[in-house]
Amino acid sequence: MKRLYRIFMMLSLVGLVSCDLDLYPETSYNEGNVEVNASTEAQYDTREEMLGLRNKIYGDWTKGIQEYGYQDFLIYTECRADNAYCGTNTAEIMQIEANKQDGENVNVTRDWGYYLTQMSNANQIICYVDRILANDPAMTQEEADRWSAEARCWKAWALFQMSRLWGSVPVVNTIPPAITSENIASVYYEYFPPQQPLDVVYSQLVDDLTFAIEHAPDVTDDKFVFTKGFAKGLLARIYAEEAIRDWNKVAQLCASVENDYGYELCENYGDMWAYTEADAVRNTKESIFEVQWTNKSEGNWVYMMFHRNAYDNMANYSWAKWVTPSRDLIEAYKAEGDTERMNTSIIIDQCAWQNYYPGDEYAFNHKVPTNVSSIIVMRLGEIKLLHAEALACLGDLAGATKLVNEIRARAKINPIKQPASQDEMIDAILHERRLELAFEGHRFFDLVRHGFDRAKKIHDEMPQKDEYWQDRLPLTQETILMPVPQSALDDNPTLVQNPGY
């Protein structure tokens, strides 16, 4: 009945609907090969229009990454584990910390739409570039391949984030044709596609990133460009996931990122988030991909969600901040004597609230210290620890230990001895990733990657260890994933709610 109703509603639009991509829902995607449906009218005709779309990739990142891809993602990754309290009494983030989220959650709803929109925008390049190459002699094959590769990196990042949050999701691959009375039934599932199982999702990720590894730009000094290095690093992350796991491929990809593109660890951990009176640091030799702002009169706004702007000290500092560092994380740094990473990741300051600490000694996330500080999406330190993880899972504990100790040496703390067992090595790597990558969006999924029991133990024990955590519903296999937003279910009757919600 719902399908018939939808078809009726679509028929009512025939004659009114052009193939403007903004007219169909953000859940409206189809599986299959990336292509423009033969009956889809051309939206773009020239190289200049395609260049504008390519540039829009990066413009969109400076906007959407702040709220959806960083701020919200830290709630899912840091506050669902042991790194951070949610920070305020905002209902939607309190629900996620307490494992009480539902399909009406504001963050869950907006983030679902954000990731689908990014894939849709990427498809405007992927689906049209060959047509423009054939019709506009100003475009070269190299440009077409490069811009498609950059769009595929964008799309793969969004799809991977989405799959970790929701599991089976719609796979974005085609631009639906205009609706006519003749095709209304056949295009239904292009406008209202079902979720795809993880093997389909991951197959798409591998396809897109394999293309990007061949055709994306080479690495340059500009780290706000999708490159071969980023594509390999993202594919390494993907092959570490249970649904497609291949530790040999993870190790090979990480080794290539480490050795083939000129990346190096910064001498000091804090160099990546440093700033002077004139400007913030960007494009360090360790950075693989970062989102950049260069104009202090505009810049990012997301700094205000976590602390102050070092260039305008009292601006937006009258209300409690999100993602407050936990006592457990601070103690983990102190137990290692790890002042280098602690003092970069966490700053102690005075404030007018006392939600988790006394107001004269309050802890804040300090990974976005100014409104022109970059958000680092991928860097070499993470890839080295992912490489260590792969080696440990392949039984090379000596190789894994060596990589961990490279990271510890940069942090100016003592090396670890080679653990006696694989499980102990994994624990050591997860601990190191926690200290190295705090507030970069990894912790919860690091734990999940190595088994439900690890994630559940840490998730469930926090309220018993520290009264400042909210009481949490026990983590279950089902609540590792977020609920599908109710609004998405209402808009697309082919979607089904995730189990447990």
Give, region by region, the residue ranges found by the protein language model.
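Bacterial N-terminal signal peptides
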Residues: F8-L16
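Long, intrinsically disordered, low-complexity segments
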Residues: S18-L21, Y44, Y85-G87, Y115-Q118, ...
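Membrane-proximal, proline-rich intrinsically disordered regions
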Residues: C19-I75, C254, R472-Y501
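Short, surface-exposed recognition loops and adjoining beta-strand edges that mediate ligand/DNA contacts
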Residues: N30-E31, Y68-A91, V169-S181, P217-M305, ...
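Conserved, well-structured interaction surfaces
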Residues: A42, T46-N55, G59-G64, T88-W166, ...
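Flexible, polar/acidic helix-loop-strand segments at domain edges
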Residues: Q95, I175, P325-L380
